[in-house]
């Protein structure tokens, strides 16, 4: 997609090349202590071996104390936005609310560290209890470990909405930065209206991996579309870059009935987004990432199955939270060794997920399912219940 801003479009690779020139990847500079130098040196040796990036192991100090499956549940931090869309009669306003919910999950990444790569068969469940008495349930499962791929489904039957995806994270190493991409589609459904909104995830750039301070930026272009209503949004996430971009986000909302965009949106690096109607020229506040977020509820450890993320990574998480990185690293190695040993016992046998079903696109006319290689085994049942009660 072409650049929708008025600013020059500088490729991220060019910015990283400049960053490498500035830092020279010197792990012996004053920005690293002795222990960090040792850890960074070990990581560089892995990189020099030319093995696939997903098989490399980042130093434990770069780990966020939770699994990627749990991190994906952050998409539900502003669920109140999604829960009201079914009752919005105007297609225009309904599309804007779906757009707002999507942006709420990506507009500002506050944690620069990397979550654990889930082991195959790992699961994570949580729920949100809302003021209207309804409950949103979330379930995720690791479908594959090498290469990694994860599926999740978030649904609220009382309010008639479903959000699901199958994602395959990939990473590239650019000198002092990591570029994290997620192949796959995010699908938002309103079954009672037979509407599906489909979009891809942006890229997350982690800077300062080897030297300097860790920081994250959301970058990349994508399109949010609703085939039934015809609405679409061209979305461009912009990092600050070398030229200190004014906007973190630029969006154009379009419809076939109009030759020009109906709305334009601009995001700032403080987490606020404004919207301008091209018809009236009026600009208003659209979203603020600093508003209250909804915290999910997770069952106590003793109630969880052994393949739940909180159980699998229990000892790693505990030691990271207690700043015991050496022991955390040892416990992480134990988890990974167990994973390798189990893989050997399954050699030649395909892994069959417990909660998600693989889609045969040749025989399946359901577009929402076709956009995800794996979908939640109860998805069709949930749709039927929503159609029945809404």
Swiss-Prot record:
Gene3D superfamilies: 2.40.160.120, 3.30.70.3490. GO terms for cellular component: cytosol; membrane. This is Oxysterol-binding protein 10. InterPro entries: OSBP_sf, Oxysterol-bd. SUPFAM superfamilies: Oxysterol-binding protein-like (SSF144000). One of its GO terms (molecular function) is sterol binding. It holds the Pfam family Oxysterol_BP. Belongs to the OSBP family. It comes from Dictyostelium discoideum (Social amoeba).
């Amino acid at each position: 997609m072409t650049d929708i801003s008025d600013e020059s479009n500088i490729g991220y690779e060019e910015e990283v090349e400049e960053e490498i020139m500035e830092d020279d990847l010197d792990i012996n500079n004053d920005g690293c202590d002795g222990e960090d130098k040792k850890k960074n040196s070990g990581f560089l040796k892995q990189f020099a071996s030319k093995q696939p990036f997903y098989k490399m192991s980042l130093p434990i100090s770069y780990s966020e104390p939770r699994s990627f499956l749990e991190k994906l549940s952050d998409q539900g931090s502003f669920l109140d936005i999604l829960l009201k869309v079914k009752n919005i009669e105007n297609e225009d306003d309904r599309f804007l609310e779906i757009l707002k919910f999507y942006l709420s999950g990506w507009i500002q990444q506050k944690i620069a560290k990397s979550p654990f790569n889930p082991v195959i068969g790992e699961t994570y469940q949580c729920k949100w209890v809302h003021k209207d008495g309804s409950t949103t349930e979330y379930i995720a499962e690791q479908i594959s470990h090498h290469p990694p791929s994860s599926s999740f489904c978030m649904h609220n039957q009382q309010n008639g909405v479903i959000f699901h995806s199958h994602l395959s994270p990939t990473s590239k190493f650019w000198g002092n930065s990591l570029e994290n991409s997620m192949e796959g589609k995010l699908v938002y459904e309103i079954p009672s209206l037979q509407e599906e909104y489909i979009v891809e995830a942006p890229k997350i750039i982690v800077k300062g991996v080897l030297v300097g301070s860790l920081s994250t930026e959301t970058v990349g272009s994508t399109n949010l579309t609703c085939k039934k209503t015809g609405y679409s949004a061209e979305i461009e996430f912009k990092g600050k870059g070398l030229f200190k971009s004014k906007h973190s986000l630029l969006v154009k909302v379009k419809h076939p009935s109009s030759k020009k965009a109906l709305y334009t949106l601009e995001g700032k690096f403080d987490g606020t987004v404004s919207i301008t109607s091209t018809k009236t020229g009026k600009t208003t506040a659209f979203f603020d990432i600093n508003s209250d977020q909804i915290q999910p509820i997770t069952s106590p450890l003793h109630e969880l199955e052994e393949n739940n993320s909180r159980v699998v990574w229990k000892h790693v998480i505990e030691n990271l939270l207690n700043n015991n990185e050496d022991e955390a690293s040892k416990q992480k190695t134990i988890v990974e060794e167990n994973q390798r040993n189990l893989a050997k016992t399954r050699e030649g046998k395909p892994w069959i997920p417990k909660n998600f079903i693989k889609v045969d696109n040749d025989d399946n006319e359901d577009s929402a399912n076709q956009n995800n290689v794996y979908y939640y085994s109860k998805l069709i049942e949930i749709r039927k219940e929503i159609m029945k009660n809404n």
